Amino acid sequence: MTNSKGRSITDKTSGGPSSGGGFVDWTLRLNTIQSDKFLNLLLSMVPVIYQKNQEDRHKKANGIWQDGLSTAVQTFSNRSEQHMEYHSFSEQSFHANNGHASSSCSQKYDDYANYNYCDGRETSETTAMLQDEDISSDGDEDAIVEVTPKLPKESSGIMALQILVPFLLAGFGTVSAGMVLDIVQHWEVFRKVTEVFILVPALLGLKGNLEMTLASRLSTAVNIGKMDSPIEKWNLIIGNLALKQVQATVVGFLAAVAAIILGWIPEGKYYLDHSILLCSSSVATAFIASLLQGIIMVGVIVGSKKTGINPDNVATPIAASFGDLITLAILAWISQGLYSCLETYYYISPLVGVFFLALTPIWIIIAAKHPATRTVLHSGWEPVITAMVISSIGGLILDTTVSDPNLVGIVVYTPVINGIGGNLVAIQASRISTYLHLHSIPGELPDEPKGCYYPFRTFFGPGVNNKSAQVLLLLVIPGHLIFLYTIHLMKSGHTSLTIIFIVVYLFGAVLQVFTLLWIADWMVHHFWRKGKDPDSFSIPYLTALGDLLGTALLALSFHFLWLIGDRDGDVGD
């Protein structure tokens, strides 16, 4: 049945005595809704995201929805004057007042790529899709579906503009880290205790293991409406920061152990004082850097929410903007300081490590008190530790390459190629994760083409995630050209910019990001199908793979350049 407004009206009755034989006076209800301009204004100002497939977010308690909006506001979400698109589907509705579950069928989506989300502002990523559902007090269930023209989706240009500024900011942060590493590689601690080079990718990878995971997790919480309440928001923030400090301390210690083992295997020599220095430096660096970056990240995400910018586009690259620089500077400073105290004040190094390790129980208690992080505290160690091991293998490649005087020029470019690849794939993983949180439940995927995840499906499909993969891949070449030229202008490094070097370097960078985006498409959906949160599981693996691929491809590139005789510059001098 269709009314004068072009809405399709479906009436289901529960057979209650007050249902009036199954007929409802829709004229009065629609007129009341259409006259409520004040609620319309409020609804357009408040960032709200509705998720129809999570029934617990739609239970009615004392006439008020758990989302914080009344039933009238929920019903009024079909605003014809704003020409918003509503996708028609049937789902099971739960009546909290009588416990009656109506007949239902599985969700049918019109188009996998047509689901959008936003915070109600024009500057946000897309427009909110508020589904209609009205549950009357007498047990009637009525569904109103409005058919209106489609709202234009986020274009590739708008997406690129939102990503570009934080991407460049993060890129210049990695360039700064590369130049710092190029300087500190000549410090005494880096020359005498070469295992510190193995620590570099593992500790810089903490931004992928922890900072980007935190950014993606909080971005998803913002986009699905879990941070609308101030109490809930601060519970999430405090719990996640405490969890991150626990993970940073443990991962920092394990990274030092991995560096000691990987350094001892090829040389066959073991020094106890060097091992203590590595453990103390790694734990202290991980703790301090993680705390500073976590505070910055919370500010970025809260600010993004208030300004209407999609945090998925900006949070993860900003998480790495100064992360590499801060982490590397702290590592170099602490390592050199502890190394200078080895002979005269030998007890300082173990005391530093014991102090930061002793703080771990405090952070565990805080994180365990918050339900949002209690689960991750018990089950979120596998990806973090595995990612640390993968990054440490990349560090072993870096340590071996730097030991060759002909390939010392690799140092300044390692944080750049690793950081850029990790930033781009983290953006994609965060966007896919948010999409899945909005349009399906863990363990189930939205309707989409079946089969294996081959590259053509990742980059040339019709969905919004395919579009973002194209945009991110197109940013690789211009971004790296800017960063290469910046390094050249700063007269940093040991490598001149020749045409052959630029071509080989860009080929390795594009291959790295192409592979990472392809893997991300499969990995995020894989963890979601297994019922695991992709924000906590996929990003550590992806950024660690970015470190390993970036370091390996860069080492191969320098070997190739040396073999073909590209020595007109000062490669390896």
UniProtKB/Swiss-Prot annotation:
Side Cytoplasmic, residues: 184-195, 267-282, 335-347, 398-406, 491-498, 565-573
Topology with respect to the bilayer: Multi-pass membrane protein
Modified residues (Phosphoserine): S136, S137
Signal peptide: none
BP GO annotations: cobalt ion transport; iron ion transport; magnesium ion transport; manganese ion transport; nickel cation transport
Transmembrane residue ranges: 163-183, 196-216, 246-266, 283-303, 314-334, 348-368, 377-397, 407-427, 470-490, 499-519, 544-564
GO cellular component: plasma membrane
Cellular compartment(s): Cell membrane
Gene3D superfamilies xrefs: SLC41 divalent cation transporters, integral membrane domain
Database matches in InterPro entries: SLC41_membr_dom, SLC41_membr_dom_sf, SLC41A1-3
Catalysed reactions, as listed in the record: Mg(2+)(in) = Mg(2+)(out); Mn(2+)(in) = Mn(2+)(out); Co(2+)(in) = Co(2+)(out); Ni(2+)(in) = Ni(2+)(out)
Extracellular side: 1-162, 217-245, 304-313, 369-376, 428-469, 520-543
Keyword list, A-Z: Cell membrane, Ion transport, Magnesium, Membrane, Phosphoprotein, Repeat, Transmembrane, Transmembrane helix, Transport
UniProt GO molecular function: magnesium ion transmembrane transporter activity
Protein family according to the UniProt entry: Belongs to the SLC41A transporter family.
Function recorded in the entry: Acts as a plasma-membrane magnesium transporter. Can also mediate the transport of other divalent metal cations in an order of Ba(2+) > Ni(2+) > Co(2+) > Fe(2+) > Mn(2+).
UniProt protein name: Solute carrier family 41 member 2
